[in-house]
Amino acid sequence: MITAAVVTFHTSRKDLIRLIDCVLHSSIDKFFIIDNSTNDALRELESVSERITYIYSDNLGFGSGHNIAIDRAIDLGSDYHIIINPDIYWNGDIIEQLVQFMDQNKDCGLVMPKILYPNGEVQYLCKLLPTPLDLFGRRFIPFKMFQEKRNAWYEMHWSGYDKVMEVPSLSGCFMFIRTDILKKTGGFDKRFFMYAEDMDLCRRIGEITRTMYYPSVLVFHEYEKGSYKNRKLLKYHICSIIKYFNKWGWFIDKKRRKKNDYCLKLTEHIRN
């Protein structure tokens, strides 16, 4: 069984309907809409298909919303669970391709496909485990050349994004995960209301299995950096980053260095 979930907060109906269309033309058996909005105006979408379950929830954050669906997926005996952003869409049944990849790579617990902008450009969402300089420097150090160079390293631009590779930190916009791994890790850490929760989850998954990037499958993402435009979102972003480093370590994080070095060596071997 394959389950999937999206968490919404006054999400564009157009985006959500487009995503639902992708889901219903795929091999996803059950799709959960966790609605954190201040009203349940999206409830009517449940009537589109019996494969859709709508859950109206208090807004406890992105990760906590997804945990509701993860618990349901575990109860249903799901084999794979997909975490999807509402502004994601794709062509064809890419889900079967991801299942085949996981079947062929039993040591992989999480896979992310290649994520593209609607115009076909690559989104650089494969990342190393971050240092404080990576996350704060890219935002607050006012030197464009420094930011670009640091980002290119942190976001692994040098990898080419054209080969299968193990990646320490993958984006939460589309995560294809073995449900038993989600059960072992306990899902998202509810302390992260918004931002950094995917980074934390991917890191915890990476401690017990491999987290992989699979560029043969393509997904489109209408990506917007909301915290760059909204002060309230910026506050959430900064708070989550602080919580992340309080949890894992700021400048002294031996596991971070070990994991990054391991993945860098693997990637260098693949490139050569």
Regions found by a protein language model. Name each.
Residues 203, 207-272:
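Active-site-adjacent helix/loop segment of glycosyltransferases
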Residues 89-125:
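Conserved donor NDP-sugar-binding/catalytic core segment of glycosyltransferases
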Residues 130-167:
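Short, flexible, basic/aromatic active-site loop/helix in glycosyltransferases
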Residues 159-162, 168-187, 191-218:
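A short, conserved alpha-helix in the catalytic core of glycosyltransferases
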Residues 33-44:
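A conserved acidic beta->alpha catalytic loop
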Residues 78-89:
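Short beta-strand-to-loop acidic/aromatic patch adjacent to the donor-nucleotide binding site
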Residues 11-25:
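Short, well-formed alpha-helical segments that are part of the catalytic scaffolds
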Residues 57-76:
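Glycine-rich, basic loop-to-helix element that forms the pyrophosphate-binding segment
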